[in-house]
A protein has these predicted regions:
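N-terminal, positively charged nucleic-acid-binding surface of large information/translation enzymes
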Residues: 1-229, 248-249, 253, 270-283, ...
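Glycine- and acidic
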Residues: 1-4, 43-51, 106-110, 135-142, ...
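Long, charged, mostly alpha-helical binding arms that flank functional sites
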Residues: 4-8, 87, 95-99, 119, ...
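Gly/Pro-rich turn-and-neighbor structural signature
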Residues: 21, 147-162, 169-171, 175-178, ...
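Short coil/turn segments at secondary-structure boundaries
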Residues: 30-36, 105, 130-143, 164-175, ...
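Short, glycine- and charge-enriched coil/turn segments that flank and shape catalytic ligand pockets
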Residues: 31-36, 96-104, 203-207, 234-235, ...
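Structured ligand/cofactor/substrate-binding pocket environments in proteins
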Residues: 54-67, 74, 82-83, 148-151, ...
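Short amphipathic alpha-helical coiled-coil/interface segments
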Residues: 113, 117, 121, 152, ...
Length: 615
């Protein structure tokens, strides 16, 4: 800046400064420096085409910390990565290219994903540079690059050899839209309207009334439960109930899990409506009836090919026609949906790979206690999640694009053959192997790993790029609160299972951006583009706005705050212009004696630096 400038051109200045940063490698990590290292486990944003306002908010906050630590004399390790494997990327490519992965050959779809990512990623990263994020972009990784795939597969192999990974076939959480199994952490509870219908089952000549929100599961009914102390149904216990419409009989069983206060007090057990059903079928060794295909359509006569909601409607119509519905009422209830697409989750019997975590909940709580949480109340959210775990971590996905699971299974004796570390990264579906046990052909696994299996080793991936000069625990993990249950928990899990260490010393949690107090969403049409904001007001004005929130608190987007930020820039410019106007004869030498006003300014400055540093 020089004194002859009459107005502040933020766009011109920011471009000039960014060029200077790039040319001079201002933010480059110095691996040879003797300075104390401050390491940041930078969140790799999911490649989605462009940065959203939530990114701009949270990455600005973490960048304040990175810059502050540099100003404090530390050697800051601040890498940058992108998360671009797994289901989120598949759905993006399907949308951009108007294709469906399931209707394409596996190798063709993978090729399309990689080609498209190569096209869109540079522009995506540029948004972070324009924002002023002071990462070292030379220390870059993508979660689908060769190195990340290698380390992710290596992690799988190590945990498998420790006996911490197993393959199990039983009712798993299943998304009919994405046609893949999902983990508990990917569930999102949504309040949805529904019909609570009371239906007539028959026990001999008597009616047995059962209320349900899911009449489409009648064909999957395997038993009826009543509480052993419920006198209303004592005479039914041990008998058979005839299922309406389908006319097969199921046992009426006394079970203490039946809620006498809910509905009629009697419930139907189906294979499978929810986790309760799965446990009940297993407990009483009931023979399951599977009526859903993997795409969520029915495969029973009269309703074959109908999607779940279509079947629900048609079955209710048929029940009413036969006078088998005695009562209906509108209710609102919480439903498990898939956080990636919003589809209601089903329970379908499939074979999947799991990391055993349920028996280590106490250990995970202990590990969480070793970390400093900023703000502290976010620690409670972590504890609540761990204590509420009901499933082992499902790490396999029935999709095309992702990190392949590095195993083969013998088609004759079912021996599991894991890849040799020298082979990594490997795609078993493309390589044939012989079973070392029986010499029969072994089939390569086509499932891919949950994307969190890779991003949960982000500290190790980043460290590998600088020959592991930085090791866990890192100094800081910055992230948003919505992924405490996924990225934070899974990273802590992996670090504990692999090295018995915490992954970071500090966790910094940011909130969401709202508009008028509401969460932003494309469906509501209330999304703010940070690119447009920076074009109109400047990156510094946006960062000024992002600084206006306490950690962990949501920040409402208000244009007046951007205007205030822009005015603040102008004030700084005018103040500096005034200084330059009065420095024409300034020689820069240290004065023998300070003026009183200079002493006052320095005291104020030192006091501010001290309070900010200690704060």
């Amino acid at each position: 800046m020089t004194e002859n400038k009459t107005s502040y051109n933020s766009k011109q200045v920011e471009e000039k400064i960014r060029s200077f940063w790039d040319k001079e490698k201002i933010f480059k990590f110095d691996g040879k420096s003797k300075k104390k290292i401050y390491s940041i486990d930078t969140p790799p944003p999911t490649v989605s085409g462009e940065m959203h306002i939530g990114h701009a908010f949270s990455y600005s906050q973490q960048d304040f910390i990175a810059r502050f630590r540099r100003m404090s004399g530390l050697n800051v390790f601040y890498p940058f990565g992108t998360d671009d494997n797994g289901l989120p990327t598949e759905r993006l490519i399907e949308k951009l290219k108007n294709v469906k992965s399931k209707s394409m050959k596996r190798e063709e779809f993978i090729k399309l994903c990689l080609k498209t990512l190569k096209e869109i990623t540079p522009k995506f990263i540029q948004d972070w540079k324009i924002l002023g994020t002071s990462a070292d972009y030379d220390i870059y990784y993508s979660t689908i690059d060769d190195n990340s795939r290698k380390l992710s597969q290596k992690s799988f192999i190590e945990l498998y050899k420790k006996g911490l990974i197993c393959k199990k076939g039983f009712p798993t959480l299943w998304c009919p839209e994405c046609q893949t199994s999902v983990a508990q952490a990917e569930l999102e509870d949504k309040e949805m309207p529904s019909l609570f219908s009371t239906l007539k089952f028959k026990c001999g000549e008597k009616d047995l009334l059962i209320a349900t929100t899911r009449p489409e599961l009648l064909g999957a009914c395997v038993a009826v439960f009543a509480h052993p102390e419920d006198k209303r149904y004592a005479h039914f216990i041990g008998k058979k109930a005839k299922v309406p419409l389908f006319n097969f009989e199921v046992p009426i069983i006394a079970d203490e899990s039946a809620d006498m206060e809910k509905g009629t007090g009697v419930l139907m057990i189906c294979s499978y409506g929810d986790k309760y059903d799965a446990e009940a079928v297993n407990k009483h060794k009931l023979e399951p009836r599977i009526i859903f295909n993997l795409d969520g359509t029915l495969k029973i006569k009269s309703y074959e090919g109908l999607k779940i909601k279509e079947a629900r409607k048609k079955i209710l119509e048929d029940l009413k026609e036969k006078n088998l519905v005695t009562e209906q009422k509108q209710i609102s209830h919480s439903v498990n949906t898939h956080d990636k697409c919003g589809t209601e989750i089903e329970f379908l019997p499939t074979e999947q790979w799991f990391i055993k975590i349920l028996d280590k909940k106490k250990k995970f709580i202990e590990q969480g206690n070793k970390i400093k949480w900023h703000p502290e109340f976010m620690h409670k959210r972590y504890d609540n999640w761990v204590n509420g775990l009901e499933w082992d971590w499902n790490i396999s996905r029935d999709r095309h694009f992702g990190v392949p699971i590095p195993v083969w299974e013998c088609e004759k004796c079912n021996e599991i053959i894991v890849a040799d570390e020298k082979e990594l990264p490997v795609d078993p579906a493309e390589i044939k192997k012989k079973c070392p046990k029986c010499k029969f052909e072994a089939k390569g696994e086509k499932k891919v790993l949950d994307t969190w299996m890779t991003s949960s080793i982000s500290p190790q991936i980043a460290s590998s790029l600088i020959n592991e000069k930085v090791k866990i625990p890192f100094s800081l993990r910055p992230q948003a609160h919505d992924i405490i249950r996924t990225w934070l928990f899974y990273t802590l899990t992996k670090s504990f299972l692999h090295e018995n260490k915490i992954p970071w010393e500090n966790v910094m949690i940011s909130g969401f951006v709202t508009l008028g107090g509401e969460k932003m969403s494309k469906s509501k049409g209330n999304v703010i583009s940070p690119q447009e904001v920076m074009e109109k007001y400047s990156a510094d004005a946006l960062r000024f706005w992002a600084a206006g929130s306490k950690l962990g608190e949501d920040l409402d987007y208000q244009e007046k705050d951007l205007i205030t930020g822009k005015k603040f820039e102008t004030k700084l410019f005018n103040a500096s212009k005034f200084v330059f106007m009065n420095l024409k004869d300034f020689n820069g030498k240290k004065p023998k004696k300070l003026e009183k006003i200079d002493e006052l300014f320095l005291r104020k400055l030192n006091s501010l630096v001290k309070s900010v540093t200690e704060g």
